[in-house]
Regions:
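Short, flexible helix/strand-to-coil boundary loops that buttress conserved ligand/catalytic motifs
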Residues: 69, 215-218, 234, 264, ...
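C-terminal coupling/interaction segments
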Residues: 252-296
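Short, surface-exposed beta-strand/loop "edge" segments at domain boundaries and coil↔beta transitions
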Residues: 148-149, 153, 228-232, 258-261
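A structural detector for beta-sheet-dominated domains
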Residues: 5, 25, 224-226, 254, ...
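ABC-family P-loop ATPase nucleotide-binding domain
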Residues: 1-8, 290-296
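ABC transporter nucleotide-binding domains
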Residues: 2-4, 9-195, 199-201
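Short loop/turn segments at beta->alpha junctions
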Residues: 89, 210, 275-278
């Protein structure tokens, strides 16, 4: 389990994390969203024990992670910027990992050779970026982690390998109750794997919800009228987005679904549809609602 309380971090005069609070349970996949510069990588590096916080607490399974080798040995971190020893083959890197991670599983390492079709005798740094990313997952999964921290984890992987990797991660979440935090700009992909989502903005989590609940609170509504579109159809509701194409009106509204629909029906529309809402749309319009200059 991950628990962060009142986390603060500055680099010089620039405050990156500002009183941040977050909690991720076992057997959960938490998607960390936010614009560039929001502090996502900084947060993940704190959780991995790379950075020391200015103030606040960071606990993994109830223990502080910074300068705590016992806790770090239960955490697998896959960075967006991978690093491997320049002269090591995959097998040599695996042997090094086995000395650093007490729960290293050689049986699993051999089994995963069927998933990752790479010659394990090859030097890692001579592999393509996509193959290096496969190696990173291969090794991380074999450490048998209790917590996985993934920063833009599947960049460079082809669609088939992405699916294989996520299947392995989700299998560990289900069978070993692994706690996963993943930061990615591929919102469509996060939508398929995450059960909780947090939006990071200016060093704080501004929205944190179960993904299903988040979708139930924001609605994409298409309305058509036989004549002109009435004014102020949802004047009493929070409208995150509104666009018009002829007699068809598209709205993104936040609030109670039944109350919103009842209000719209008062204007006697010819057509009233609720459309599927993607995580990407939720992200855009939630941020748009707090002053982001996002154009469509």
């Amino acid at each position: 389990m991950i628990e962060v309380k009142d986390l603060n971090k500055s680099f010089g005069s620039f405050k990156v994390l500002d009183g941040l609070n977050i909690r991720v349970k076992k057997s959960s996949v938490y998607g960390l969203l936010g614009p560039n510069g929001a502090g996502k990588t900084t947060l993940i590096k704190h959780l991995a024990g790379i950075y020391k916080q200015d103030s606040g607490s960071i606990l993994v399974n109830g223990e502080p992670v910074f300068e705590n080798p016992a806790v770090k040995s239960s955490v697998a971190y896959i960075s967006d910027d991978l690093y491997f020893f320049s002269q090591y083959s995959i097998d040599e890197t695996a042997r090094f990992y086995s000395t650093m991670y007490p729960k290293w599983n050689w049986k699993r390492y051999e089994q995963l050779k069927q998933v990752f079709p790479i010659d394990s005798g090859k030097r890692v740094t001579r592999l393509s970026k996509g193959m290096q990313k496969q190696v990173a997952f291969w090794l991380a999964i074999c450490t048998m982690p209790e917590v996985m921290l993934l920063d833009e984890p599947v960049d460079g992987l082809d669609p088939v390998m992405r699916k294989k990797v996520w299947n392995l991660v989700l299998q560990d979440v289900a069978e070993r109750e692994v706690c996963v935090m993943v930061s990615s700009h591929n919102l469509r992909e996060l939508e398929d794997v995450c059960d909780h989502v947090g939006i990071l903005h200016n060093g704080k989590i501004i929205v944190e919800r179960e993904l299903d609940n988040m979708k139930s609170d924001i609605h994409k509504i298409q309305v058509a009228y036989s004549g002109s579109i009435p004014e102020n159809i949802l004047s009493g509701e929070e409208i995150l987005h509104r666009s018009q194409n002829g007699s068809v009106l598209l709205m993104i509204a936040k609030g109670d679904r039944e109350k919103i629909l009842a209000k719209i029906r008062e204007s006697s529309p010819a057509i009233l549809d609720i459309l599927p809402l993607t995580l990407e749309e939720i992200f855009i319009y939630e941020l748009g609602g707090i002053g982001y200059d996002i154009k469509n």
